[in-house]
Amino acid sequence: MEQTWRWYGPNDPVSLADVRQAGATGVVTALHHIPNGEVWSVEEILKRKAIVEDAGLVWSVVESVPIHEDIKTHTGNYEQWIANYQQTLRNLAQCGIRTVCYNFMPVLDWTRTDLEYVLPDGSKALRFDQIEFAAFEMHILKRPGAEADYTEEEIAQAAERFATMSDEDKARLTRNIIAGLPGAEEGYTLDQFRKHLELYKDIDKAKLRENFAVFLKAIIPVAEEVGVRMAVHPDDPPRPILGLPRIVSTIEDMQWMVDTVNSMANGFSMCTGSYGVRADYDLVDMIKQFGPRIYFTHLRSTMREDNPKTFHEAAHLNGDVDMYEVVKAIVEEEHRRKAEGKEDLIPMRPDHGHQMLDDLKKKTNPGYSAIGRLKGLAEVRGVELAIQRAFFSH
């Protein structure tokens, strides 16, 4: 695997020198300063590429070229935003950057309720608490009909939890959910959030798929023409939330994408931390089934709690994800490609890490502190080395 590291640009508290010392060779980044929907110019792409290469690294993957909400709702200037997206792909290809991670999650990107969940060893992790999320949705956001998405027990627990929250607890929970986590290009006030949810009141899963199909049919032929591989990131968590449909959550969703636009440019990011929160998924089977179309991997683990929809981000080699079998399946796919004469490695990043050691005293992007990811990258690197030596040393 190609060892990569997500970097949020010049304002990231983790420097490119840090990235190189961590042992990564590739950088995963994006032009976050360009508004959603606008074209990434060749000049801006080359400027960022030069910064990365001057540090002795390569820009391996774009994560992400964000998709304007008008495209998802099929309203407003969606045709112009699609045309802009096509041009951005052409410009990236012209600059030699050919793997693009993206997602089609409506309104919110990845979602957590607690950004400082303290683990038994004192380090901090990210957590999604189903009951706290229910309390937010029913008692703070007050979304009409929200009760239909929860069990009677969850509704009662959410009311009890809300009753014990201080004003600061409520404000913190609201910020965590709607203010925008790292990589999310949108943040909202509560009123703005309600208005954005309202835009989806008539959009169910079938309609969102229809809108996604329009996007794919416009984008994938351009990607194929210029040699760019699109790698869709799964929904996180991989299920409907807030009354919003989610359409990249299951194996069936993945197969739908392939059937809708059957091009090798239409591929996937295998995020084990997203798919892995569901006990009914076999990650190794997913990798084997869609291996030829996996162009990027996020490797981390999660731990489901008593409520199966509550989880926290575990250490990379612990939790519910069998990282050994996952890495083995990815390495096997790389060797399959090599046998076909394809020498390219699959970019891997350790995704999120725990906030630990000296990083506990620093301001960090949630999930993206340096030391926790350094640890995760080293652990996954060790797993891969052992697998390569044991099974592929010939």
Swiss-Prot record:
Pathway the protein acts in: Carbohydrate metabolism; pentose and glucuronate interconversion
Pfam families in alphabetical order: UxuA
Enzyme class: lyase
Catalytic function, reaction form: D-mannonate = 2-dehydro-3-deoxy-D-gluconate + H2O
Single GO MF descriptor: ferrous iron binding
GO biological process, one term: D-glucuronate catabolic process
Protein name, UniProt field: Mannonate dehydratase
Gene source species: Escherichia coli O157:H7
Designated gene of the protein: uxuA
